[in-house]
């Protein structure tokens, strides 16, 4: 039990002694496990729920067992986190980044790696045959051969991430820009030829040509490209909503304001409604976990996902500067 029960030990010991148990139980007190930049107090959580700031006690920004499960944390990752923290009588706080480290380590070889476009812009391959679709083999997880492979449809019109194209790129930008050649992951080399904008100057289409001899992502003449980007077939893609979560507490300003109220992060939830995913996602079920290539780990939301309306919660981003203490 936790340290506040330490004062009750004499009474506890007296009861056990007087009952003359042949194998008397022992009471051991230890400090509570606190996490940085999260809300754990029931009084505060209740207020967040009542004010509609979170959508319930299982809101993925909270750290209740129900919330962690909904967000996509596995039992194994939580157990590993507790093991790393250890048991102590000294009051201390564990870095939330350690919990994120544990779920990354648990999922990196378990979760299928699939392509999802969170902020899509259309990519048109001008010299690709009109109306043609070909199926390309893609490994589900290079770290786990047991997960096998799948086939992904490729065609003339694709979606790529908007951030993977720039008209006037800075130095060391190796993705798509006019005149540059990149690799479409597990597909072909493509060379950007330009873009189309709407009346407001926003890019609505990127155009390119492909090298038919580079199928699989390698060129027979041995030429190299520095950029590799992911994609999905525009016609056969699955539409989904994706929720990106950050800590509910503003890390820089601390947990509490001067008046004792919580210092909430206004950007703790970002909802993306126009995401495009490869067609294999259509079979996803509640609590299924995936790695979105180049994005992070995601879990199908059990509460808001409906037939034909997929909702994903980001469990954790793909990379972090956190280093496990020795």
Region locations from a protein language model:
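Catalytic adenosine-cofactor/nucleotide-binding cores of aminoacyl-tRNA synthetases and other
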Residues: 1-326
């Amino acid at each position: 039990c936790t340290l506040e029960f330490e004062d009750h030990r004499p009474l506890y010991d007296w009861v056990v002694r007087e009952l003359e148990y042949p194998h008397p139980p022992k009471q051991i007190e230890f400090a509570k496990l606190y996490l940085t930049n999260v809300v754990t107090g029931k009084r505060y959580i209740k207020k967040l729920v009542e004010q509609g700031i979170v959508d319930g006690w299982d809101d993925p920004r909270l750290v209740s067992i129900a919330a962690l499960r909904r967000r996509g944390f596995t039992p194994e990752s939580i157990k590993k986190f507790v093991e790393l923290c250890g048991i102590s009588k000294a009051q201390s706080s564990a870095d939330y980044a350690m919990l994120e480290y544990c779920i990354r380590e648990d999922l990196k070889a378990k979760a299928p790696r699939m392509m999802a476009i969170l902020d899509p812009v259309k990519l048109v391959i001008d010299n690709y045959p009109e109306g043609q679709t070909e199926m390309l083999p893609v490994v589900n997880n290079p770290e786990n051969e047991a997960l096998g492979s799948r086939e992904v449809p490729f065609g003339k019109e694709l979606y790529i991430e908007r951030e993977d194209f720039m008209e006037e790129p800075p130095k060391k930008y190796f993705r798509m820009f006019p005149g540059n050649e990149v690799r479409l992951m597990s597909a072909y080399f493509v060379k950007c030829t330009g873009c189309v904008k709407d009346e407001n100057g926003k890019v609505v289409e990127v155009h390119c040509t492909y090298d038919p001899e580079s199928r699989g992502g390698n060129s027979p003449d041995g030429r190299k490209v520095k950029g590799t980007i992911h994609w999905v077939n525009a016609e056969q893609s699955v539409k989904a909503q994706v929720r990106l979560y950050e800590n509910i507490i503003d890390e820089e300003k601390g947990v509490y304001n001067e008046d004792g109220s919580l210092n909430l992060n206004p950007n703790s939830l970002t909802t993306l409604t126009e995401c495009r995913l490869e067609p294999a996602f259509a079979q996803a079920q509640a609590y299924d976990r995936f790695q979105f290539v180049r994005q992070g780990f995601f879990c199908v939301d059990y509460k808001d996902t409906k037939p034909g309306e997929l909702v994903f919660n980001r469990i954790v981003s793909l990379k972090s500067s956190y280093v496990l203490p020795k």
